Amino acid sequence: MEVEAAEARSPAPGYKRSGRRYKCLSCTKTFPNAPRAARHAATHGPADCSEEVAEVKPKPETEAKAEEASGDKVAGSAAKPRPYACPLCPKAYKTAPELRSHGRSHTGEKPFPCPECGRRFMQPVCLRVHLASHAGELPFRCAHCPKAYGALSKLKIHQRGHTGERPYACADCGKSFADPSVFRKHRRTHAGLRPYSCERCGKAYAELKDLRNHERSHTGERPFLCSECGKSFSRSSSLTCHQRIHAAQKPYRCPACGKGFTQLSSYQSHERTHSGEKPFLCPRCGRMFSDPSSFRRHQRAHEGVKPYHCEKCGKDFRQPADLAMHRRVHTGDRPFKCLQCDKTFVASWDLKRHALVHSGQRPFRCEECGRAFAERASLTKHSRVHSGERPFHCNACGKSFVVSSSLRKHERTHRSSEAAGAPPAQELVVGLALPVGVAGEGSATPAAGAGLGDPPAGLLGLPPESGGVMATQWQVVGMTVEHVECQDAGVREAPGPLEGAGEVGGEEADEKPPQFVCRECKETSSTMTLLRRHERSHPELRPFPCTQCGKSFSDRAGLRKHSRTHSSVRPYTCPHCPKAFLSASDLRKHERTHPVPMGTPTPLEPLAALLGIPEEGPA
């Protein structure tokens, strides 16, 4: 919508005398001030272009009076030619200044800054309307939240966020909108008017400002800074939503459960949890989603598109948030700190998961065996032991696995064999220590392994005083794939090759090609454990030195763990005795030395189910 400002010597009937007048170029109505002109501009239908204001030379007083007397302002305006056509959209204008003013809506140029807050505007009349907000001229106040507006039309658009009203429906796709300007922008997408494309990922936009916002997701630029907490954002709208958290403002409240939200989109997604509505359908797999962001993220998984690129290491990501989190690995930024042990984390959910270690909470309990877990994902993996579900399948050989990490380890055997030009050698289960009498029938069990020693009784879930063969002697099991069969699912499986395969497995294990390559000298190792042991000889791969003793580490986590040896901090306390430990893994090892009540699930139970070992009590 375009509104022109004109000089007038006499006011229109019913208005105060004013030196400037504002005229609508769609219907040629005139107004005595900018706010009234802007309110009127919003009343025109969605077919008009986005709100623009052009300042032109004033008409003579006689011509203005003649037009008012004739009452034929609309016809007179429509009869004039519009020789200045926009090359980016179908609009045309009578004068070159009007076209230049309109062109700012495509380029995103905002040459008129607010002297109070620095906000910039495309047109001077929009700046004048904005300045009224600094002067306190906000007569239109929302009844549902503290927001106020200088124009009634803006208040009506805002109130639709509370009521859920979306009167502007797209005839092509059915999508509806509350704001007519957003609806007009959406209509351009159907017209194919997306002249601004991203050079990195090819995504196209109808407006230059939208492209600029998108480009920040690639560059990581976040120019909008919160004055309260220092957090930065790539969009001003994101900063506005964030600032509501500090102000404790949640203007969007669910009528069903009373929960409040800072953003309209979050409120709308929440509403679907009550209705069960999932309007976003994936055409490839039929999966449905309740919010568009989850749907877009799911689609990228099908397409394999990872448009967000890390400049330092070359890694690609599907989401800008994932890239932002990954960048903390390079910068060392770990903003989430545990208040009990001073450990820091890259992501908030890592801190929440870590906090369960101190609290001892395990809210997710297995209904089959009673074992409890700190995370729902761990319970889901554990439940597959009971159900026999193995949802992760190898595309090369058809083998199935309980967890995705096991599938990834298995797939490496195919890749290494293809690189060596030979079929994969027969896999072995080697070096797996099991007590005598537990290996099951039909398994080839050689003599007891020398030097293994007696296992701690707690590792097998047995009290020290309980005798029997299960707590006295261990053997090394070396059996080929045909000996490993799950009795529940009937799927044969073996873990990847372990250390010592050449000693027990015979000649076939020697034929297996190396899998892991040193980053520094390209020397190959058959296992990741051997590779890590070898890489310790390269000081270049251990860039994190201890300032107290000079010992260096390959990662920051190893340095933090080592630093505790110089201090008295031992954050992990045993719930059964007063002992404390430097790490959670040391605590778990120690807990196994305590007697375990009969029938308590132990870490060996999933392994026993995998190998088809019958569940028996201690002898």
From Swiss-Prot:
Linked residues for Glycyl lysine isopeptide (Lys-Gly) (interchain with G-Cter in SUMO2): K57, K59, K65, K80, K154, K512
Keyword terms of this UniProt record: Acetylation, DNA-binding, Isopeptide bond, Metal-binding, Nucleus, Phosphoprotein, Repeat, Transcription, Transcription regulation, Ubl conjugation, Zinc, Zinc-finger
SMART domains the UniProt entry points to: ZnF_C2H2
Cysteine-cysteine disulfides: none
A GO-annotated cellular component: nucleus
Location of the protein in the cell: Nucleus
Keyword Transcription belongs to the record: yes
Region described as Disordered: spans on this chain: 34-79, 492-513
Phosphoserine PTM sites in chain numbering: S10, S387
Modified residues (N-acetylmethionine): M1
Biased composition (Basic and acidic residues): 54-71
GO MF terms held by the record: DNA-binding transcription factor activity, RNA polymerase II-specific; RNA polymerase II cis-regulatory region sequence-specific DNA binding; zinc ion binding
Role: May be involved in transcriptional regulation. May play a role in DNA repair process.
UniProt protein name: Zinc finger protein 668
Source species: Macaca fascicularis
Phylogenetic placement of the source organism: Eukaryota, Metazoa, Chordata, Craniata, Vertebrata
